[in-house]
Amino acid sequence: MENIIEINNLTFKYDNKNALFEDLNVSIEKGKITTLLGKNGCGKSTLIKILAKNLNYNSGSVKIEGKELNSYSLKELASILAIVYQKNETPREITVYDMVSFARLPYQNIFFYKPTASDVEKIEFALEKTNLQAYKDKRVDELSGGQLQRVYIAMALAQSTDIIILDEPTTFLDIKYQKSIMQLVRDLNKSLGITIIMVLHDINQALAYSDNIIALLDGKVIKNDQASNFFDETLLNRLYDADIKIEDGKVISW
């Protein structure tokens, strides 16, 4: 087992408030789908913002691919880690192809950007792997919610094939598109070996599509284990402060 992300003794607090994370230790396995699970306010979104260098932590160590996070420039980090946030602004009158090409924009001279041959190859690769080739000339504001989510995943894929973080990727989708997106995530992981980190609110999705789950409660990891070891009513009830029932391998009430 090789860990692609190692977090040791991490402390983080907002302004002068009490620490959200204190001596947090997390390891994320390379090439696996790992889901962060827990109720609102437990630290899931904060953790991915730290990994993206959108928030600075107070102390401790965060290593990605063996290198300290603070040693990465934003451009270097973007080449190995991409994030699809829960809420994204959708521009009007722009094609799917142009939208995905934005992922290849450098951090300088963006107004003079012209795709290189390598950029074009990665854009076409991302469109192919997300089944968007037939839509590449279509305007993004004409797409369904599920198709649009594929565009955002394609953008992440065009940016990085090392680590992709998905923040609630199915929240605003109906059941049909939820299953389609989760199957796409699994296919990308299995076919390309991409390390995928997800934040999910749906426990059944986490149990069905994750290799590993990290359970966070009040800024602490209470369990980091294979998903198959999370079919535990006592654990889930503690995690969500709810009356959760599991039947035939699924959460049926909570």
For each predicted feature, which ranges?
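Conserved ABC ATPase signature
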Residues: 139-143
